[in-house]
C-alpha cells in the first residue's frame, strides 16, 4: 500500500472512487483482524496509512458532491444552510444594505423639501 496522492484521486470518476474506498475499507478490516489476532506486527504501521487513504478518498468524493450541489442551487433563490457561506452570528443577523439605506416617510420628505445648507467661508 503506497501513499495515495490527492491530485491523482481528483482525476478519477465517482464510481472509481467508491470502488477504491471499498477496497481500502476491506484492507483496513484485514489489518484490524490481524492486529487482534497478533499475527504480523509489521502490518500495524500500515493501519494509519490506510486510514489516511480512506480519509483522502472521502474528502475528494465529498468535495465533489458539495461542488455539484452548489452548481445546482446557484440559480435558485434559496440555498440549503450547509451550502451558504460560513459567517459569524452577528454577520448573519446584520441588516442588509437595502435595509440600512431605507428611510421613513418623514425623513424622505425632509430631505426633498429642505436641501442641505451650504456655507461659504471667507478667508
Curated annotation (Swiss-Prot):
GO molecular function: mRNA binding; structural constituent of ribosome
Key words, A-Z: Ribonucleoprotein, Ribosomal protein
Gene Ontology cellular component terms for the protein in this record: cytosolic large ribosomal subunit
Signal peptide: none
GO biological process: maturation of LSU-rRNA from tricistronic rRNA transcript (SSU-rRNA, 5.8S rRNA, LSU-rRNA); translation
InterPro entries xrefs: Ribosomal_uL29, Ribosomal_uL29_euk, Ribosomal_uL29_sf
Domain of life per record: Eukaryota
Protein name: Large ribosomal subunit protein uL29
Species this chain originates from: Theileria lestoquardi
Lineage per the UniProt record: Eukaryota, Sar, Alveolata, Apicomplexa, Aconoidasida
Gene: RPL35
Amino acid at each position: 500500500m503506497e501513499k495515495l496522492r490527492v491530485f491523482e484521486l481528483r482525476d478519477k470518476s465517482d464510481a472509481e472512487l467508491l470502488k477504491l474506498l471499498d477496497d481500502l475499507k476491506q484492507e483496513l478490516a484485514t489489518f484490524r483482524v490481524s492486529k487482534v489476532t497478533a499475527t504480523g506486527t509489521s502490518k500495524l504501521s500500515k493501519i494509519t496509512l490506510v486510514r489516511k487513504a480512506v480519509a483522502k478518498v472521502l474528502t475528494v468524493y465529498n468535495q465533489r458532491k458539495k461542488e455539484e450541489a452548489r452548481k445546482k442551487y446557484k440559480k435558485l433563490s434559496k440555498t440549503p444552510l450547509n451550502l451558504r457561506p460560513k459567517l459569524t452570528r452577528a454577520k448573519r443577523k446584520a441588516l442588509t444594505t437595502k435595509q440600512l439605506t431605507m428611510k421613513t416617510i418623514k425623513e424622505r420628505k425632509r430631505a426633498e423639501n429642505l436641501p442641505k445648507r451650504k456655507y461659504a467661508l471667507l478667508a
